[in-house]
């Protein structure tokens, strides 16, 4: 099996990096993205590592850049993204970057502070302008109110606002007032509070400000209203001011005479004009600063986060006692060792160091990470497999087979020619525009997820077209491409049909045994005549049910066969002789035999003998019961009873074959090894004497948690494990075969939903023969298209997708795929280059 079908061969290597070259070497390795660093300081606190100060400086620069980015986005300035991949700055360049970011941050903060103060002043002047504009009307109304209060007829009603001695003298009444501005939504509550606290002894007038005013702190526009409150006495004045303060109303001085108000308004307008000019200049300066930053901020982000990633990686390394060398351990693919060596040489040259960096391969029994190379086409399918579990190192990778089997099984459930075309067109659109979509960096998580599976959707659509043609199903209707192979005419000429037969029967059955009625199989797929047959569902159910069983058993047998390649590669002959062979015999003797029976029945019985065809279900049940009644179900072939009894006995013998032999042989081997004293020690291979290379290797003691240390053999545990595996496999063969019937069930459900949608929606519009019907068809078709996309494409498509996922994860992969590995996570700048800064 080639590398396509297995994970890459990995090796553990030791890097010796000179202190002055370590930064540049790690930078080159990050650009290459082919090595995974191991933490050699697991017991050291992150705040006590050597490069923690550099990491903090990078985080501080990152914070400043995020502040600048926030200001840029707030100003709606587009951030330029040229796709440039800047080189990592040298450590000495960090000071210049820090100074630059500090300058930009301080400048923006100063501008924001000044702008906020100016806007607050501008808001106050604007509110004062509206107060002066509205007060004349308020004062006129107050004067009228005052005259009414002085009227003897109204004297008793207004007594609460008049002092007793003034009432006696009839002296003129002087009212105090306050004017201000308040948020419009607070006016009703404000008015009720004034009325209750002041007991109705105040006169409130308010008017809305037509244009919303900008809040200097938040930048939001707020609707406000001008108010003026008339009262008498200092006690009411204090109450009114406290209420205004509680409602966060802004109070402003307002002259009493019209002349003074006019002069003040003139001065306010002049100050507003001057302030507006200063505000415009401040905003222009802020825009220039932000636009200049927007051109470079993406590059700055990449530089800073590359530096941070490098220093974080350097913190994983050990430092020798001389402080002149950093020691790192990395997992890397064997095929990429040359490119890694070249990257180290390049990094050493960039740093100006004269001492080369050294890469030394190490021998270890630790389990390496699993690394499957993918491209943009296979990446989605590999993600489907990895979602179940990361493959064990070097075991068979299901992804290459999933590329075909997953969309095919999806299409078996989804098969519809029309729906397949719609799905394919959507996928083709995403594939053709993938460069533009990738450059736009969509933040919509749902669309990003769909886009990442564009090639999966493309194949699902293409296979749906294929299965739709086989089912001859296009939006629940059949396509009569080649003409039906069935003919009615021979039923009149050679059969016993007459005109009276047609008139007297609502349903008639064509007899394929009569020559000429059935002209042979349809060239491709199902004959379109079945679309109008009353027994269409009976025929399709039988066909799809048997097809589901056949596909399921073939799929599972293929999975069991793949386990053979794992056993051969890992040199486990016991698993072949006492695992693979009995498993394949068990499944083939029972369910493989069922597939043979299905094909045999299809070929052995024709139109003349189909009435005598026995039931496969009854035969299969009788096979397990060893029951063969002479009356009822006839035998399919001669010698059937003996063959079926033989197959059952063989299948039953496979159970102890799988259950007992392997644990007993392992126990015998263990006792023999124990007797000879040839057990392995530790996790590192030990020979007669360490070579020079081995002596260097044994110095490191940071063993991974994934190491496969030799353990004491426990016969009981082995026996229990083998019993669980045997029971799971034997019962799984039955349950998994039944599970594949979901192919039939979902295909039936999809076809029926499609037919219901056609009958209940589009059929109505097509049967109205008038101008109104033509106009109505436009809206009916819109509803039909919407329901087709929402229900049949999205909901049914998602359902079929999940069921296909289940069939691969459980029914297929559990035959050969353990999925207990851990993923290869190389140190790479790729996610930084793509703008995924938060990862």
From Swiss-Prot:
GO terms for biological process: regulation of macroautophagy; synaptic vesicle lumen acidification. It is found in: Cytoplasmic vesicle, Clathrin-coated vesicle membrane; Cytoplasmic vesicle, Secretory vesicle, Synaptic vesicle membrane; Melanosome. The modification Phosphothreonine is found at residues 257, 367. GO terms for molecular function: ATPase binding; proton-transporting ATPase activity, rotational mechanism. The keyword Protease does not apply. Coiled coil: none annotated. It holds the Pfam family V_ATPase_I. Predominantly expressed in neurons in the cortex and in the dentate gyrus, CA1 and CA3 regions of the hippocampus (at protein level). Expressed at lower levels in astrocytes, oligodendrocytes and microglia (at protein level). In the cerebellum, present in Purkinje and granule cells (at protein level). It comes from the Eukaryota. One of its GO terms (cellular component) is plasma membrane. Keywords: Cytoplasmic vesicle, Hydrogen ion transport, Ion transport, Membrane, Phosphoprotein, Synapse, Transmembrane, Transmembrane helix, Transport. The modification Phosphotyrosine is found at residue 371. The chain crosses the membrane at residues 396-414, 417-433, 449-478, 543-562, 581-601, 647-666, 727-751, 773-811. InterPro entries: V-ATPase_116kDa_su, V-type_ATPase_116kDa_su_euka. Subunit of the V0 complex of vacuolar(H+)-ATPase (V-ATPase), a multisubunit enzyme composed of a peripheral complex (V1) that hydrolyzes ATP and a membrane integral complex (V0) that translocates protons. V-ATPase is responsible for the acidification of various organelles, such as lysosomes, endosomes, the trans-Golgi network, and secretory granules, including synaptic vesicles. In certain cell types, can be exported to the plasma membrane, where it is involved in the acidification of the extracellular environment. Required for assembly and activity of the vacuolar ATPase. PANTHER family: V-TYPE PROTON ATPASE 116 KDA SUBUNIT A 1 (PTHR11629:SF68), VACUOLAR PROTON ATPASES (PTHR11629). Belongs to the V-ATPase 116 kDa subunit family. V-ATPase is a heteromultimeric enzyme made up of two complexes: the ATP-hydrolytic V1 complex and the proton translocation V0 complex. The V1 complex consists of three catalytic AB heterodimers that form a heterohexamer, three peripheral stalks each consisting of EG heterodimers, one central rotor including subunits D and F, and the regulatory subunits C and H. The proton translocation complex V0 consists of the proton transport subunit a, a ring of proteolipid subunits c9c'', rotary subunit d, subunits e and f, and the accessory subunits ATP6AP1/Ac45 and ATP6AP2/PRR. Interacts with SPAAR. This is V-type proton ATPase 116 kDa subunit a 1.
């Amino acid at each position: 099996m080639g590398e396509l079908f297995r994970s890459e061969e990995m090796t553990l290597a030791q890097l010796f990096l000179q202190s002055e070259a370590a930064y540049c070497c790690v930078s080159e390795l990050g650009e290459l993205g082919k090595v995974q660093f191991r933490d050699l300081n697991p017991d050291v606190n992150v705040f006590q590592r050597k490069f923690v100060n550099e990491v903090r400086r990078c985080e501080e620069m990152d914070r400043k850049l995020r502040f600048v980015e926030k200001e840029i986005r707030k100003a709606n300035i587009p951030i330029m993204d040229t796709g440039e991949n800047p080189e990592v700055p040298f450590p000495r360049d960090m000071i210049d970057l820090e100074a630059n970011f500090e300058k930009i941050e301080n400048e923006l903060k100063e501008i924001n502070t000044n702008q906020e103060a100016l806007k607050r002043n501008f808001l106050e002047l604007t509110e004062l302008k509206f107060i002066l504009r509205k007060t004349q009307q308020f004062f006129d109304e107050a004067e009228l109110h005052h005259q009414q209060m002085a009227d003897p007829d109204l004297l008793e009603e207004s007594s609460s606002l008049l002092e007793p001695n003034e009432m006696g003298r009839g002296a003129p009444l002087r009212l105090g007032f306050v004017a201000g501005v308040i948020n419009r939504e607070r006016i009703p509550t404000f008015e009720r509070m004034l009325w209750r606290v002041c007991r109705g002894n105040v006169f409130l007038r308010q008017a809305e400000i037509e244009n919303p005013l900008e809040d200097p702190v938040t930048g939001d526009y707020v609707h406000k209203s001008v108010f003026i409150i008339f009262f008498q006495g200092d006690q009411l004045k204090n109450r009114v001011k406290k209420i205004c303060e509680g409602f966060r109303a802004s109070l402003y001085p307002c002259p009493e005479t019209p002349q003074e108000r006019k002069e003040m308004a003139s001065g306010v307008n002049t100050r507003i004009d001057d302030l507006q000019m200063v505000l415009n200049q401040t905003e222009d300066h802020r825009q220039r600063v932000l636009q200049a930053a927007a051109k470079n901020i993406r590059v700055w982000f990449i530089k800073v986060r590359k530096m941070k990633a490098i220093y974080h990686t350097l913190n994983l390394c050990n430092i020798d006692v001389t402080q002149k060398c950093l020691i790192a351990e990395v997992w890397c693919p064997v095929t990429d060792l040359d490119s890694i060596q070249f990257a180290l040489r390049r990094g050493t040259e960039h740093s100006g160091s004269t001492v080369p960096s050294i890469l030394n391969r190490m021998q270890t029994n630790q389990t390496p990470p699993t690394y499957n190379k993918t491209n943009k086409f296979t990446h989605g399918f590999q993600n489907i497999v990895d979602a179940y579990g990361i493959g064990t190192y070097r075991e068979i990778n299901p992804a290459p087979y999933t590329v075909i089997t997953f969309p095919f099984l999806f299409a078996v459930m989804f098969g519809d020619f029309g729906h397949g075309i719609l799905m394919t067109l959507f996928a083709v659109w995403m594939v053709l525009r993938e460069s533009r979509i990738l450059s736009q960096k969509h933040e919509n998580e749902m669309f990003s997820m769909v886009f990442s599976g564009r090639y999966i959707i493309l194949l699902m659509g293409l296979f749906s077209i294929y299965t739709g043609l086989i089912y001859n199903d296009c939006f629940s209707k059949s396509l009569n491409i080649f003409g039906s192979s069935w003919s009615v005419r021979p039923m009149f000429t050679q059969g016993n049909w007459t005109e009276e037969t047609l008139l007297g029967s609502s349903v008639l059955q064509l007899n394929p045994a009569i020559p000429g009625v059935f002209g042979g199989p349809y060239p491709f797929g199902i004959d379109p005549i079945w679309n109008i047959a009353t027994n269409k569902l009976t025929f399709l159910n039988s066909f799809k049910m048997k097809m589901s069983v056949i596909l399921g058993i073939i799929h599972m047998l293929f999975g069991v066969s793949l386990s053979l390649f794992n056993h051969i590669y890992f040199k486990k002959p016991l698993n072949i002789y006492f695992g693979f062979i009995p498993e394949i015999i068990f499944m083939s003797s029972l369910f493989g035999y069922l597939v043979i029976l299905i094909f045999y029945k299809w070929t052995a019985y024709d139109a003349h003998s189909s009435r005598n065809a026995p039931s496969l279900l009854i035969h299969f049940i009788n096979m397990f019961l060893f029951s063969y009644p002479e009356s009822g179900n006839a035998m399919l072939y001669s010698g059937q009873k003996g063959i079926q009894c033989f197959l059952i006995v063989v299948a039953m013998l496979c159970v102890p074959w799988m259950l007992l032999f392997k644990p007993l042989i392992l126990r015998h081997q263990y006792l023999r090894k124990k007797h000879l004293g040839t057990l392995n020690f530790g996790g590192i291979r030990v020979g007669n004497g360490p070579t020079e290379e081995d002596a260097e290797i044994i110095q490191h003691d940071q063993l991974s948690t994934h190491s496969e240390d030799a353990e004491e053999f426990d016969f009981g545990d082995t026996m229990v494990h083998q019993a669980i595996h045997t029971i799971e496999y034997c019962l799984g063969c039955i349950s998994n075969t039944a599970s594949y019937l979901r192919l039939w069930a979902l295909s039936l459900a999809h076809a029926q939903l499609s037919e219901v949608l056609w009958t209940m929606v589009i059929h109505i519009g097509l049967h109205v023969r008038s101008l109104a019907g033509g106009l109505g068809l436009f809206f009916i078709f819109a509803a039909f298209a919407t329901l087709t996309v929402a229900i049949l494409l999205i909901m049914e498509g998602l359902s079929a997708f999940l069921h296909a996922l289940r069939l691969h994860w459980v029914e297929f992969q559990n035959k050969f795929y353990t999925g207990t590995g851990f993923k290869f996570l190389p140190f790479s700048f790729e996610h930084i280059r793509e703008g995924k800064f938060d990862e």
